[in-house]
A protein has these predicted regions:
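Acidic, metal/ion-coordinating pockets
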Residues: 1-252
């Protein structure tokens, strides 16, 4: 089975990059299932009903979220109405369960979403290590894919090794820069520290460059605006064939 996981889709340029590339990538790599992180889809903060509908129409099967889960009020209705939006399991007030189990040709695949706690400025978060243990104990599945939305690479690597051999993949999201450390861990789990961002190419992790530069050089803090110009598509392809697993980076 081949799974395409698309990195944080950021703003209108991210959505454009998604719509322009997803069909070709699915065809070229014989993709069976598409998962995408959508927490930045609406101007960098959250997701709307309209964007959700567009994502479904373009071929995404499951949407994961992150620290901007509640960035748009539409999320509350979407969580009530839709089953394929997965929000971080270690939110204490998570109205769902932080995972979604789906069936593909008789195979059960469980997608788990977790938030890191290091440098994430949310003291209410539960421990992602303990929460994922609880999910794995309670939910029996043929395959498990974990989206770990976290800032610190050390926390991501630690969770990857902690879950090595127990899940099929631990995929880092949030930092918006694709890392080159994709690998198969010693006990068979596929790992990458960050899948990267699908969005503006020449902004600062999605934001208009001058806004961020002014913050660093002049101390001027302005509202973030999505960068314009060129765009990029980042993701990974997971081959979770039981005989030989692999992870391949995609950058367009």
């Amino acid at each position: 089975m081949k799974i395409l996981f698309i990195g944080d889709i950021y703003g209108d340029l991210g959505r454009e990059a998604l719509y322009e590339n997803i069909a070709k990538v699915k065809k070229d790599y014989n993709i069976n299932l598409v998962i995408a992180n959508g927490e930045n889809a609406a101007h960098g903060r959250g997701i709307t009903k309209k964007i959700y509908k567009e994502f479904m129409e373009c071929g995404i099967n499951v949407i994961t979220m992150g620290n901007h889960t509640y960035g748009n009020k539409d999320i509350f209705d979407l969580l009530e109405e839709k089953s394929n939006i997965v929000i971080p399991a270690n939110y204490p007030a998570n109205p769902k369960c932080g995972y979604q189990a789906i069936n593909y040709n008789g195979t059960k695949i469980t997608i788990i979403n977790l938030l890191g706690r290091v440098y994430m400025n949310n003291i209410a978060l539960d421990c992602p290590f303990k929460i994922v243990d609880k999910i794995l104990e309670e939910v029996k599945s043929d395959h498990y894919i974990v989206d770990f939305h976290a800032e610190a690479t050390s926390e991501k690597v630690a969770l990857g090794l902690y879950l090595d051999g127990r899940v099929d993949a631990v995929l880092g999201t949030h930092t918006h820069v694709q890392t080159a450390d994709e690998r198969v861990l010693p006990k068979g789990t596929l790992y990458i520290s960050d899948v990267g961002m699908t969005g503006p190419l020449n902004g600062v992790i999605g934001v208009e460059a001058n806004i961020v530069i002014n913050k660093f050089t002049k101390g001027i803090i302005e509202p973030n605006k999505t960068a314009t110009g060129e765009k990029q598509f980042n993701g990974v392809i997971l081959d979770i064939n039981n005989n030989k697993k692999s992870i391949t980076r995609i950058h367009i």
